[in-house]
Amino acid sequence: MDDSRVQLWVKTDPFLLGALQIPPPEKFSMHYLRKMATYVRTRASEGCYPRLCWCMWRHIACGKLQILEETAWLYFETFLSVFERSVAESLNWAEVASTCPSSEKYEEVKSKLSVDTLKFMLFLYIQQINKISLRSPLIGNEWPSPRGRSPISDFAAQSSFYNKVWDDYSHYNFIHNHLTYILELLMEPNQLSKVSQFSHCILISAEVVTALGFVIEGTVDKNRVVNAFLDLAIWQPVQIKSGFIETLGSFSFQKLQAWIKECLVINPFGITSCIKSGTKLSWAQQVDGLNKRAKVACNTYKVPHTHRMVVMSQISKQTLAKSSKTLVDARVKIHRCSDCYIYLLSPLRSVTVEKCQNCTIVLGPVQTVLHIQMCYNVKIIAVCQRLSLLSTTNCTFHVLTPTRPLFYCGNQGVVLAPFHISYSMLEDHMAHTGLATVPNSWDRPFFFSTESSNSHIWRLLLPEEFFTFVVPFEMEGDTTEIPGGLPPAYSTSVQQRQQKIRMWQETVKDAGLTREQRKQLQAVVEMKFNEWLIKTENRHQLDSLVS
C-alpha cells in the first residue's frame, strides 16, 4: 500500500470523557508533570512504573502536586473507570466496593488498584485543553492557520465557557501544537536534556508510542478499519517516515514527530463529520411556528461500532421516544431542546445535554459520563457511571450512580433525587454497560469548584415531594421493578400516598352513592384531573403521546 494513504486523528473519548470541564490544577503544568515523570520512573519497584498504584498517586498528588485526596481520587477513578475497566471488571468492582464492611477495608481494596503510568500522565496533561489563558486573546491563533475554524458553532457552546471537549478542531489543534511536549513528557528523563540540541539522535521506545495510542488512532484503508497507533507506526511501508528502527524496536524522535504531524487530520468519526455528512434521521416532528427545524443526525451506518454518535437539536413541543440499535453504545448530544419529553431507552456510551429548557429526558444506562450544562428547568432520569453539572438552573436529577455527582461552577437550584423508573429491558441494559445497583452515591455531591455547598446550589428532594414516574411504553424484557428499589424515606412516602388513595376509594365505595351521584362524582374528578393536567403542563405530554 502507498504510505500516503495513512491517516491519523485524535480520538474523541479522551477529551469528551476524560477532560474535566474546569481549568486544571496549577500544578498540572508541564514543569510539574515532568518532575512526576522522573519520579515514577525512578521508583518502578515501589508501584510507580509501568503501572501507577493508587497509593503512590495519592502520595504524588497530595504531597508533590498539593491537591486534595478526594480530587486525586476523582482523576484516578475517572481514568480507571472510563478507559481501563471492561464491563465485567466494572461489575466486579461494584460488587467488591459495595460489600466492604468498613471504610478501612474499602481503602485497603482501593490500594490494590493501578493504572497505566504513561497513559495516565498523558490523561493529566490533556486536562490543559480547558486551561484559561490570559494571553490567548492577545496572541490569537497561528496565521495563516493550517486548519479552518470549526463549522459546528450551532452545536458547540459559544459562551464564556467554550465546550472544547466536543470540538474535533480543538482536539486536533491541541495535539498538533503540543506534540513535542507530549513526547518529552513520556520519554526517558535522561533523554530530555538532549531534545534541544540532539533531537535527531533521540530514540523513543515502543511503550511511549503505545501510550500515544491513548489519544491517536488511524487507518490505511479510508476509514474502513481503524488501527491502533503503534500498529500503524511499525507498518513496513511507513517505517522510514515514522522513524521506526526495527533492530532496536525504537523510533527516531524527530522523524516520528514529523510523521505524526504530516498524517494528522480531523477525526472522520467526530461530531463535525456527523453533522456535515451523517445520516439525517426523521425521529423528530417539525412543529409549525418554530424558527428552526428539529434535527437528528447520526454516523452509525458509516462508522465502526466503537465510534457511534447521535446529535439531536431543536426538538420542541413534542415527545420523542426511541429504543434503537442506532443508539446502542453511542455518544449522544442533546442540544437546544425545549418544552419536550425525550426517551432514549437503549444502553448509551455517553450523553451531553446542553442549552435545553423545560424538558424531561429519560435515558437508558449511560456507561460513562452524563454531562449537563447551561440548562434550565430540566428533569433528567438515568443510571450513569458519573453525573456532572455545569451552569444549570432549577434542574432535577433522578439518578443511580456509583460515583458522587460532580458539580462544576455556576449551578443553582439543583435537586438530587433517587432513581425511580423501570422499563422492561433496563436491567439487561445495565449489565451491557457494566452498571450495578450498588454502590449508589446519588445524594453525595462533590463540589469541584470554588463554590461552597450551600442550599441555593443544591438540595435533596423531600420525600413528600416525591412521586413515581411511569415510562409509557411497552417493551420485551424482564425488569418489572425499580433496580435497587427506593431509599426507605421515599418508599414510605409512596406507600403512605397509596394508602390514602385506597382509603379514599373505600370511602367512595362505602358511601352508598346512587348511579347518578357516581356519574356526578366521576365528572368532578375528571374535571379536576384535567385542570391539574393543564396546570402542570402534562396535558401536552399526553397529547404528544397520542400523536
From Swiss-Prot:
SMART domains: CARP. The keyword Protein transport does not apply. It comes from Xenopus tropicalis. InterPro entries: C-CAP_CF_C-like, CAP/MinC_C, CAP_C_sf, CARP_motif, TBCC1, Tubulin-bd_cofactor_C_dom. Keywords: Cytoplasm, Cytoskeleton. Belongs to the TBCC family. GO terms for cellular component: centrosome; cytoplasm; spindle pole. Its main location: cytoplasm. May play a role in the regulation of centrosome and Golgi apparatus positioning. It is found in: Cytoplasm, Cytoskeleton, Microtubule organizing center, Centrosome; Cytoplasm, Cytoskeleton, Spindle pole. This is TBCC domain-containing protein 1. Residues 304-435 form the C-CAP/cofactor C-like domain.
